[in-house]
Amino acid sequence: MNTFKKAVAGSLFLAVTLASQAHAEDASCATVTLGDPGWSDIAVTNGIASLVLDGLGYDVKTQTLGVPIIFAGLQKGQVDVFLGNWMPAQQANYDKFVASGAVDKVAENLSGTEYTLAVPTYAYDAGVKSFADLNKYADKFGHKIYGIASGAPANESIKEIIAANEFGLKDWKLVESSEQAMLVQVGRAVKRDEFVVFLGWTPHPMNVQYDMKYLKGGEKYFGDSGSVNTLARKGYAAQCPNVGKLLSNLKFTQDMENAIMDQVLSKQASNDQAVKDWLKANPEVIDNWLKGVTTREGGDALAAVKAKL
């Protein structure tokens, strides 16, 4: 082989080697474990991630856990990815695990969120426009605030408000339950035109299902307009660069999540089917998610994922 041929052969070998290394991942990357706190919006985003990862040739496991346990799982390497780091609601957990360097922030996946106490519009129109107004109507509310599952950061904020007698709420009680049970209580109260105060957030179909308003004055505990981050166990994106690239690309919109959640909560489709139907109707979003991403074996990611739809 002459010098020129050797040079060409060497260049080709190097190119193939580098391409292989670019997509090479540790064997442990074959299975991706997602944390799920049991919320409708994260069921949607986990469903999207699962469908895409499955198309790329990865196995996906979902662990349904409380938020504090998900953070601890990320720190211990028992959970790979969490798509539901709502900020600033989870600021304390973020500071403890992410800001300290124990868990990695990969990207912001959603912006413009709202997360605070809410009331039906008829209660708002009657004078309950802020946290400071709640205790004026304590009897109508039954001295109760309806929250979500125990351990949720928002519940802890409500407990802090009550313990500190903020807004005169020391005699109030937080009722903890699942998201679904909370919304059943809200629906029951709305049918009877009764006062009810509960934890509300966007995106969520509750904003369409109920004529509701968010209360002002709780910014100290719930912050202003927020965002949602994608987190991963420390070093995960470097260890599993192909998955890491996908995670950094995954961006959602409120309209997207609301549309899918509405299909699920109105029982028109399962979560997996609603995700698939929405992506079939909006395939252009997949193009951006898969930029710089391949299948696990280094193949055409776009073709593989669209074949799953």
Residue ranges: model-predicted function:
Residues 1-23:
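Gram-negative bacterial Sec-dependent N-terminal signal peptides
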Residues 23-33, 53-54, 136-142, 287-289, ...:
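Immediate post-signal peptide segment of exported/extracytoplasmic ligand-binding proteins
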Residues 46, 63-101, 181-185, 204-211:
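Pocket-flanking alpha-helical
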